[in-house]
Amino acid sequence: MSVKINGIEFGNELFPNNERIFKSLPWQICAQNFIRVDFKYQTDLDIWKLIVAKKYLDDKFNGTVIVLNMLYVPYSRMDREIEGYAFSLKYFCDLINGLNFHQVKVLDTHSNVTEALINHLYKINVQDFVDKVIEKENPDYVFYPDSGALKRYSEAIKLPENIGVFYGNKQRDLNTGKILKFELINCPEDIKDKNVLIVDDLCSKGGTFIASAELIKNVGAKRVCLYVSHCEDSIFDGKILKTDFIDMVYTSNSINRSGSSEKIYEFCI
């Protein structure tokens, strides 16, 4: 599922030439004052399906309140102008704004740049999900992989007073993406046999989190778990699920994944 209208899948069939088939919906599905469009990005094709869905709804149900539920915002990594690259996040957000949804619901954007670029934005509170993980894992410390995550989550979530905080610093080869160096900043002296929860917004293959967890366990931590709001399918290609550095991954259902693992616990939104 990549696009649903009030729970009904839209545009999932194909003509022989691979063009999408967009069937009209039963009028009863949208015979109300509110329509919810759920959008889960997998490929750029899904963006086309979203465009057709909104244009169709505008034609057939003009005047109805239409809300976009887009928990993960595509292209959120490209949140600044970088020489040699197109500012793709801005152009994607321009497209969403042009569709003129009454409200756009998102979860844990990669940066405040995304929030500034999308009109009629509603942020789902990440605090609720972090609280659930804390209740399950009872961590002694929360670890943020970099200073950006430290700043973002220090403002977005409130931790119990008994949970300490430290963070990481990494040097990355911008051409290859490979992590060249990783270090722990303000690592607590009493971390031996303690539980640590890593918190961030997005996981792909998880190289940063493996580097973090390996160092944290090497200095004596007993258990290291990870909370990410968005977990891409590529986690199955990385080392997180194949090694013992990270004991459990907590995430949302914001992105479709082709597989499953006993080490992944999913919150449904």
Segments (PLM) and residue ranges:
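PRPP-associated nucleotide enzymes
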Residues: 1-269
